């Protein structure tokens, strides 16, 4: 039996114990993990330092290094995230709906654990902790496979998690870590039908495409974020600028950052120069359509590929659109279905945008950066789904459960 298959088998056995534990036992385990992460903080930071050194030698981009980096504050943030999950309502056992049939059968739809969840992800070590916290609270075991660039960090984090679990009723085997740089381990995970109930990829477009195309285990596709901000002719100029700067510049290397700006031609000449000046002072490279190049000298002409690119860096594609419909058509063609925002004071235009744009999250007069489990009140998230089955948008505890039908009778048989 291969190592990956053996890990999944151990997780499946442990999941049986986890699935029947009550909320108090699960919360106690999460608190123990949080305490152990704080106790092991220096060890974790030292391990992360090795990964950062290796990443710099490998020439990782600044955005990837930012995703990879851990600090004392970021570890504290992980711990705070766990504590928030502790406070969240346990979805397991929740009765979603009930009804009675004419023959007297009482039927209830009840939330149950997923079972064993496989997580394949890149760079971000915080995903290790967020995933474990959410999966354990939702009653599922987890098999983790992070990227080789974060191997030392993930190894230290999983060690702390397992040490925390050793003090609780939850078996250590509920958390398994594929401690290998072999990319073949990912392919093996994707074919573990009967052992893994679900695989969630979280990373760049290449990783997600590879998982979706090769998996025989069910997959929830988390999103590449080619997000747009559309500044309508009826937008408040100051509000539009503030939203744009937040959506693009607050943090470049995240999937809910804006990658394209669409501006109605009715305000482009007056509004764009000031907006681009603000972007330039923050080091953002502009790639514009022909109309943008006419309005602003020195702007790089956008290539067709730029409209479909998730830059994850200080680069922004800007297009002047002739009207609202032109903006909708552009978003329809290039959106990855993650997060899309309109800035306008016209309520009818906003309503049409929110109705017609096909994305996991649509915004009116707000930044795309809010597409996040914490911001939505879910606590830590396992990812942001851009598909429509089984979950969409930020995936919290409820999205990590399934359900079953509990049917009670008094001796009924089918005629």
UniProtKB/Swiss-Prot annotation:
It is found in: Cytoplasm. Pathway: Amino-acid biosynthesis; L-proline biosynthesis; L-glutamate 5-semialdehyde from L-glutamate: step 2/2. GO terms for biological process: L-proline biosynthetic process. The keyword Amino-acid biosynthesis applies. It catalyses: L-glutamate 5-semialdehyde + phosphate + NADP(+) = L-glutamyl 5-phosphate + NADPH + H(+). PROSITE patterns: PROA. Keywords: Amino-acid biosynthesis, Cytoplasm, NADP, Oxidoreductase, Proline biosynthesis. Pfam families: Aldedh. It comes from the Bacteria. It is an enzyme of class 1 (oxidoreductase). The keyword Lipid metabolism does not apply. GO terms for cellular component: cytoplasm. One of its GO terms (molecular function) is NADP binding. Its EC number is 1.2.1.41. InterPro entries: Ald_DH/histidinol_DH, Ald_DH_C, Ald_DH_N, Aldehyde_DH_dom, G-glutamylP_reductase_CS, Glu-5-SA_DH, GPR_dom. Belongs to the gamma-glutamyl phosphate reductase family. HAMAP family: ProA. Catalyzes the NADPH-dependent reduction of L-glutamate 5-phosphate into L-glutamate 5-semialdehyde and phosphate. The product spontaneously undergoes cyclization to form 1-pyrroline-5-carboxylate. This is Gamma-glutamyl phosphate reductase. It comes from Desulforamulus reducens (strain ATCC BAA-1160 / DSM 100696 / MI-1). The gene is proA.
